[in-house]
């Protein structure tokens, strides 16, 4: 608060400071209203020493799609590893619940490319379409892949007018009936930073 009170009103860091204050308020509230919860690691079958995140679970709970920065088994992703962060590009994997209710060994989705970032966003209610973040354009946009002939097809850019732009679009979620799509963008005209937008499919 001291920084906000004494900084130039045009400072770009004011919004960051205000967000940090709001986060502190949330943290205090949660600490004062603790709930008994148990968090379980999915174990070595799913997790590795590299980063795994952005899980999206199917409606029936039988499939888990997630983003991982693990290296490819054939080492073809090695030339694209970030030497500073020791990160490999993002890829999407899926694991399924087997007959004894444990997770199967994750499989990389067919459309992933070793040199690009493809990250999980969400999965449609019928699990026939997966929405993907892809940075092939340089700015980061929303793509999708449809399930056909027993596999996910090559990704396609989401072409509905008003979604992808020259700005950064990172996430989207579609209602079960497919009518409404909510997405995140840092385009000009919002409240600042990344904002949530909605488009509606017309009859």
Language model region names:
Residues 2-203:
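Short, conserved micro-motifs composed of acidic
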């Amino acid at each position: 608060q001291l920084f906000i009170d004494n900084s130039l009103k045009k400072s770009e860091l004011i919004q960051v400071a205000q967000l940090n204050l709001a986060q502190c308020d949330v943290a205090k509230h949660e600490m004062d209203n603790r709930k008994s919860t148990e968090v379980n690691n999915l174990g070595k079958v799913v997790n590795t020493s590299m980063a795994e995140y952005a899980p999206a679970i199917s409606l029936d709970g039988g499939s888990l799609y997630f983003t991982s920065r693990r290296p490819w088994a054939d080492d073809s992703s090695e030339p694209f590893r970030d030497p500073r962060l020791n990160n490999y590009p993002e890829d999407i994997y899926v694991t399924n619940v087997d007959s004894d209710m444990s997770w199967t060994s994750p499989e990389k989705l067919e459309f992933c490319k070793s040199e690009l970032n493809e990250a999980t966003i969400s999965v449609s209610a019928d699990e026939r379409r997966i929405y993907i973040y892809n940075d092939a354009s340089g700015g980061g946009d929303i793509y999708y892949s449809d399930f056909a002939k027993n596999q996910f097809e090559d990704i396609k850019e989401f072409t509905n007018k008003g979604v992808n732009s020259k700005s950064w679009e990172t996430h989207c979620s579609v209602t079960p009936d497919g009518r409404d799509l909510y997405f995140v963008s840092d385009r000009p005209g919002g409240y600042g930073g990344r904002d949530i937008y909605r488009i509606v499919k017309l009859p």
